[in-house]
């Protein structure tokens, strides 16, 4: 009978590993010991760790610490991982050691075994590439894992989230310009206020998103400084001079992003204030999107018993019992994602404040929450733009009706009659179901010509 496992050995003894798995003993122990939940370490984080391993091998070769054959084998293995050929070989859960050591070893072991396959060596033999002595040379999980989180977060924000936000603000700006002359009633406290244009209202949404985007980009500044070379506690034990600079140069070349050596490894390794700051700005973006989704839900309410100044695309039936009902489902999906991100931010803040002495032991949670938030935001913003914003249209007839019926237009005649008389006019109009002109004339405060001259809606914009 063919065995479906092989026997591997580590410092704790022997263990059975699936026969075709490219991971090794330490990864297998993590699978057994941490069967918790379904959340896996994000593949983006795996790729960033792999980038570090590739860069480290080049640095170690340039410093004369490994030979060219070992360097080439590690680089080839890393290239295959970065090409997505081995995604299934990274099965570890987020809920593991707080340093991320098991995931670091998962990457080390897979690289080692890819090299073994390329040289017809036995899986798990650690030949010709040893996961610790070669792949992990000059490194510790304590410096590589936080560096990998930082690289992943910067990469995801700059290359994915920011372009997605800009696509949304561009369409909002286009619609703002298109409807710049469409006058509607404004609302504060859910009550009628003075008029504005629909273009102005939409411009507020767009600018709010641009402000959030800029704040996120600014918060990234400190993430470009990596703690590589700090090794175990920040002192750089077992890391040769020049390794950090060599590694970071390779990472910068591979990502087309400019990373630098950290000014103080002790700070970055013991706490993740910089990551928490980025997550805080991500939460602010979520808050802006939440507000916009709520505005659209309110403005599109109806169609006959609500405000209904905004017509949204009808993508699917809204009810299993009420025929013809269409709901603002894209807004609801966006709101749920934003609520989830706000919860993630709280967890990151709590995790960041809970580190001890020379290390924060919540690294997998912090990395997972931030990267998951970024992916969710990218997906939901794109969906929101395509399925709702692109197709939304103003209900000009309802806007005109609501504008003409609003008692708050009385604000326009305050300069003529004063605040107290204007309030009296509005109250009379409401109580006796009069329009503002009728109420003003009835009270004798202005004649018809004086009212018409004062009631210039365009002058209120």
Residue ranges and their predicted role:
Residues 1-461:
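Conserved, well-structured ligand/cofactor-binding cores
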């Amino acid at each position: 009978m063919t065995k479906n496992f092989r026997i591997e050995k580590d410092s704790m003894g022997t263990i059975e590993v699936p026969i075709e798995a490219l991971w090794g003993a330490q990864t297998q122990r993590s699978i057994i010991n941490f069967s918790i939940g379904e959340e896996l370490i994000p593949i983006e984080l795996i790729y960033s760790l792999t980038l570090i391993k590739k860069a480290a091998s080049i640095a170690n070769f340039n410093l004369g610490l490994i030979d060219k054959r070992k360097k080439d084998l590690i680089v080839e293995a890393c290239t295959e991982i970065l090409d997505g050929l081995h995604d299934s070989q990274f099965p570890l859960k987020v809920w593991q050691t707080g340093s991320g050591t098991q995931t670091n070893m998962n990457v080390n072991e897979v690289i080692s075994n890819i090299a073994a396959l390329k040289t017809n060596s036995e899986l798990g033999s650690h030949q010709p590439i040893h996961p610790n002595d070669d792949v992990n040379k000059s490194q510790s999980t304590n410096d590589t894992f936080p560096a990998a989180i930082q690289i992943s977060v910067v990469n995801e924000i700059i290359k994915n989230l920011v372009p997605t936000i800009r696509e949304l603000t561009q369409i909002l700006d286009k619609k703002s310009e298109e409807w710049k002359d469409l006058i509607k009633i404004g609302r504060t406290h859910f009550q009628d206020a003075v008029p504005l244009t629909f273009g102005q209202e939409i411009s507020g949404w767009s600018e709010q998103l641009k402000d959030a985007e800029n704040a996120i980009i600014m918060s990234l500044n400190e993430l470009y400084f990596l703690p590589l070379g700090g090794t175990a506690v920040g002192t750089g034990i077992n890391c040769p001079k020049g390794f950090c600079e060599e590694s970071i140069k390779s990472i910068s070349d591979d990502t087309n992003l400019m990373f630098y050596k950290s000014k103080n490894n002790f700070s970055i390794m013991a706490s993740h204030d910089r990551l928490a700051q980025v997550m805080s700005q991500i939460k602010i973006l979520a808050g802006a999107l939440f507000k916009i989704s709520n505005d659209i839900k309110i403005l599109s309410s109806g169609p006959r018993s609500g405000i209904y100044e905004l017509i949204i695309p009808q993508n699917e039936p809204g009810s299993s019992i009420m025929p013809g009902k269409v709901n603002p489902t894209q807004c609801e999906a966006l709101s749920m994602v934003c609520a989830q991100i706000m919860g993630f931010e709280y967890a990151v803040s709590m995790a960041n404040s809970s580190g001890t002495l020379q290390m924060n032991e919540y690294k997998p949670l912090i990395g997972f929450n931030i990267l998951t938030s970024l992916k969710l935001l990218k997906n939901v913003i794109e969906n929101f733009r395509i399925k709702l914003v692109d197709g939304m249209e103003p209900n000009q007839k309802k806007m005109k009706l609501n504008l003409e019926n609003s008692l708050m237009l009385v604000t326009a005649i305050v300069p003529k009659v004063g605040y107290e008389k204007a309030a009296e006019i509005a109250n009379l109009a409401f109580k006796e179901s009069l329009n503002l002109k009728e109420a003003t004339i009835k009270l004798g405060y202005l004649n018809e010509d004086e009212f018409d001259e004062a009631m210039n809606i365009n002058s209120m914009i």
